[in-house]
Every structure is written in C-alpha cells, then in structure tokens.
Amino acid sequence: MRLFQSTCVLVGTVLPLFTAFPISSPREIEIIPDKYIITFKKGIDQAAIEAHTAWVSSVQARNTARGFTTAETPGLERMFSIHNFNAYSGSFDRETIEEIRSHPNVESVEPDSMAYVTELIEQRNATYGPRRISHREIPTGDNSYWYDSKAGEGSFVYIMDTGINKAHVDFEGRAIPGVNLHDVAFDDTHGHGSHCAGIAGSKTYGVAKKATIVDVKVFTRGGGAWSLLMGGLDWSVKNITGEDRQAKSAVSISISGPTNQAMNNAVKAAVEAGVTVVVASGNDGRDAGRNSPGSAPESITVGSINSRRGMDTRSSFSNYGSSVAIHAPGEGIISTYKGSRDATANMSGTSMAAPHVAGLIAYLQSIHDLPDPAAARRKLLELATSDKIQDVRGSANKLAYNGSGK
C-alpha cells in the first residue's frame, strides 16, 4: 500500500463567525396536507401493481366527478420499486385515500411529511476531518491527511441532497449529473449538497480524492418531502444495480426527520439489493431511533464528534443511541460550496459527519474486496478506533479510521 500525504491549506471562508453549537430544537412531524405514501404488501407482482394503479386512477376520476377532488389533490405522482419494496406517493382527497387504505394489496398508508438537511451552524475553525480519520490518536504535531494512493479510484459516492456545484475546480470533473427530481437547473443553489460532496470526494477536502461523485438532487432548499427522498433512493439503487456497481458504491444521505416507516423500509430494501447506505444521525441531541432514516437498522448511521481540548467528544447536537454505528468529525468542517468554481464554506452538523464515512467506504472499496454492504460495514467497523469518544450515550464508541497506520 502506497501512502500519500495531504496537508490541507485553509482558504478564506464565506461565512460568519460563530462560537457555540446549540442543539437544534427537535422537529415535530410536519405533515404535507393531502399527500400520502402508500406501501404495497410484500410479494406483490408487477401485474397487480399495474392493476392497482389503474384502479386508483378510476377511483380518483369518480371522485373528481363527484366534486371531492380539487387541484390540490391530483392523484398518483410517483412510483417506487426498490428490490422487494414497492410503493407510490400522491395527493388524494379523503374519500379516495380511505378506499386505497382498504385495498387488499395495501400494507400501509402514511402521510407524506417533511425531512430536512442536517447542517447545524457555520463556524470559522480549522478543518480537521480527513486528518482525524487517518490517525488513531488526535494529531497534535502532524497536520497531514495520510491516505492510500488509490484514494477511491473506480468507486462512486451518490450524494442525495440539494445538488452539487459540479463545476467546482476541486471536483476535477469527477462530479457528474445523476438525477434531478425538480424542474429547475441541475445545480446547487442552497450549498448543503456541494459541501457534503466535497467532504466525500473533493481534491482538497475529501476523503476519497479520486472517487466519482454522483449528483442526486432531491431538494432545492433545506427541506422537502420524504417522497422526494424516496424517489432519489429509488433512482440511485436502479443506477447502481443496473451498472453493477454494488461493490464500488455508497449512497450518502445527510437528511433527517421524524421517523417515517416507508423511508426506513426503502433503505432496508436498498441494502438488501446490495447498496451501502450511509446516513446522518440528526442534530436534535436526542435518541437517533426517533429519526429517519437514521433509525433504519440496515443503514450505517453516523454521529458527529469534535476534538477540542485534546479529546474526542460527541457533539452536543449529535443524535445518539443504539442506532448510531460510528462517528466522524462534524464540527468546523471546511469544504466546497455553491456560487463559484472555488467557493468554500465552514459548516457543522451530522450532515458533515456522514459524507466522511460515505467517502471512507468508497476509499476502502478501492483498496479491498468488499462485495456487499455487509462486507463494507464489517471492514469499516473493524478498522474504526474504539473507546476514544466521550459522552456517546449508548452509541457505538467507534471513530472512523482509514487504516493508514498512523
């Protein structure tokens, strides 16, 4: 293994100075009026799905004629098929949704609700993320990131977020368009997605410096419907399995909200299809089991740490508990940003911790034979530094490490 050394040079950030990291107020479920996610029972075949959707259209048409349906409830909008998970979402009037709920092929009907990106606050501190995960101990005299020369080459990280500033020089042309679920420019006008993408795989700030970064634009702002996130995951799984990339890909989701079982089931199906899914634990300072997709047992749920005062400590905002499999740096992280070809920003949150781990998985996939999510998870946790983090509150006391030997 040939180790490379990278010393981060800090550039001017575009964000104001903050000195504290308050816990985000835990979000209550924010239901989107008249929008629902309908999950089919396991084992349903395609013919039955097509028959059901035709039936839904007929029910909707009948209720439109009766005056029950309005412009706000146009009917079926999006279909999902991830491995053995089949579902759809749409806007339905009360009469139509009650008929759907009673259909023998329907497992569950859930209101569609909001999920949010999980950055917390911006702060002008020196970035330390890649440096920390290439050292067993907190580096005091070594400001370098040590990494294998393969550096994620041939691997893919799918960033499900607000889009990516793909023209940024630090991506070196490796950030490519995947899918845009909105009728807007395929770019990032929010900044969160570009920042996460840079942590995973940019030249200066990234963990997997040679990986391909795939832009899966699910939100245009800091929040959106679960059904949009499910649509992005549906596309990602189909793309990964269609290109036979299961052993060379990770999906990174730095989005969180109150528990949504359909979203958790979609993650479960993605992993069963052979796709590794990494998610942020959330910034509520509470048990991650109360959030999705962090509560999905099949996901690799990531908490945030800081390394102030000479010790690694769980960030006060970071969700915790048995759902959290591993931690990574998440405070004062400098990375790529929106707006120009060289924009940077300094941000904090479990949103920043998760792409460290997604990038690390892509990095490890380029070095080791990791054919499926179980193997990727096993290698990640096998390498992780144990029992160094203060105040884990029931989370796994594991800190991401790239195996550099430093």
Swiss-Prot record:
Entry keyword Secreted: yes
Chain residue ranges for the region called Disordered: 283-309
One of the protein's GO biological processes: proteolysis
Glycosylation sites: N125, N239, N346, N402
Protease is among the record's keywords: yes
One Pfam family from the record: Peptidase_S8
Top EC class, one word: hydrolase
One term of GO molecular function: serine-type endopeptidase activity
SUPFAM superfamilies the record matches: Subtilisin-like
PROSITE patterns: SUBTILASE, SUBTILASE_ASP, SUBTILASE_HIS, SUBTILASE_SER
Function (record text): Secreted subtilisin-like serine protease with keratinolytic activity that contributes to pathogenicity.
Protein name in the entry: Subtilisin-like protease CPC735_023170
